[in-house]
Amino acid sequence: MQHKQAMQTMALAAVCQAAWLVQQVARNGSCDEESMRCLLQGVLITDPNNAESVYPDRTLLREGYKTLVEQLGNNRNPKNVELTRYVIGMVALERKLSGKRRVLSALAERVSQVKRQAFHFDLLTDTVLSNLAGIYSDQISNLGPRIQVSGAPLYLQQPQVQHKIRALLLAGIRACVLWRQLGGRRRQILFFRKKVIAAAEAALRQL
């Protein structure tokens, strides 16, 4: 049971990290590349042996765990409403996606194409990012209310920044899929918040 909670929390931390990185890119035009790469690699792992193999290096999820603790904790610091909005938006889109077999099939085919492309190009090249962004735009964003990203107009109007943001939203939804597969439900965040925080804090101590 403790291991299951740890894996659910890992997946939720990945969702939070995607939201955090979206915010960084929208505000600054860039973000920590290794933290981003970790999440994008998770998108390409479609048939994992176990949950750990989706995010094998959990040190790269540090910001996600920290964000999870800060957003759910009872600390006096004000919550980041923007991050909460992104997380809720990704969870909602994943729920819409889960019931649409035709969309899931098309999405799987597009991800397979990116996998083949990733043999020849680095994940963070705009060639790959634009294709990941295209998957989000074509297959997912229209399933429900669009996630409105706030940031600096100077950056948000740049195609490369748009590609990064959409690729990260796709990565966040992939993490939502894993979280749900592991038994994660929204009510657990509401009613078992202390357990989630404790698991995230335990993970941070080990990083």
UniProtKB/Swiss-Prot annotation:
Source organism superkingdom: Bacteria
Gene3D superfamilies: HflD-like
InterPro entries in the cross-refs: HflD, HflD-like_sf
Compartment(s): Cytoplasm; Cell inner membrane
UniProt membrane topology term: Peripheral membrane protein
GO CC terms: cytoplasm; plasma membrane
Pfam families noted in UniProt: DUF489
Main location: cytoplasm
Keyword terms of this UniProt record: Cell inner membrane, Cell membrane, Cytoplasm, Membrane
SUPFAM superfamilies, A to Z: YcfC-like
NCBIfam families assigned: PRK00218.1-2, PRK00218.1-4
Family: Belongs to the HflD family.
Name under which the protein is recorded: High frequency lysogenization protein HflD homolog
UniProt gene name: hflD
